[in-house]
Structure formats: C-alpha cells, structure tokens
Amino acid sequence: MKRTYTLQEANQALALVRVIAAELIERRASRRRLARQREQLESANTPEGLRGELAELDARIWEHDEATTGCKAELEDLGMTVLRTNPLTIHIPGVSRTGDVVFCWEEGEGSVCFGHPLGQEQHQRRPLRVRAKGA
C-alpha cells in the first residue's frame, strides 16, 4: 500500500519521524567513532594479537548497521524513503493542490518546508509555496 501525505499530515508525522531519525543519527555517529577506532587499531602495527579487539569492533559496527537498517525499514513502513543518511534526508510522498509531490525533510528542520515535483527527487529541493488561508 502506497501512502501519500498532505503537507499537514507530513508535518504531523514528523513527531514519529524525529524519534526514528534521532536513533538513526545517534547510530551514525557511534558507527563513525567505532570505524575510526578500528582503523587506528589496524594501522597500529603492534606485535600483540589485536584480532579479538578488531572482532569486537566489527561486531559493534554490525549492530549499528543492523539498527540503522531497522530505522530505515520503519520509515519505509510509513511510506517514506531515506534519500541519504548524512545529512539525514527523508522523502515523503505527498499530494498538493497542484498534484503529486515529494516532500523533503532534512535533519534539524522544524517542519516539512521543502519538496520536489514528482520525478525530480534527485534534483535540488525547493522551498514549498504555501498559500495563506483565505487567499
């Protein structure tokens, strides 16, 4: 089932999206730290056996990768798509008074205020033009 959102519904869904996004962002940062530690251990050139430490880091990195995949799946269950994870950018299929659109939310934004015409999701996002009530 393909879900589409009005702009109002997309903004209401942000409460849940932000919770999922916070976990994804935290996992992204932790994974990056672990990967740096792994690189440092690998390049240490010490005679001690570091295989155990490397295996432990690999296991922790894998856990973060799995959790990130789970976060993406939760967003996909809502009908949304993760365009990229840094910065976290989420596409929300939508409908406006002029037809189908793709709303675009990026980490740190307070509301859904950017979008793309359908079929132009890879292009630079554009500010949404919202008509004032009564206009």
Predicted regions and their residues:
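Glycine-rich, aromatic-bearing surface loops/beta-hairpins
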Residues: 69-135
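Structured domain cores in non-transmembrane regions
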Residues: 33-65
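Sparse, context-dependent recognition of short Cys/His-centered cofactor- or disulfide-binding micro-motifs
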Residues: 5, 9, 42, 60, ...
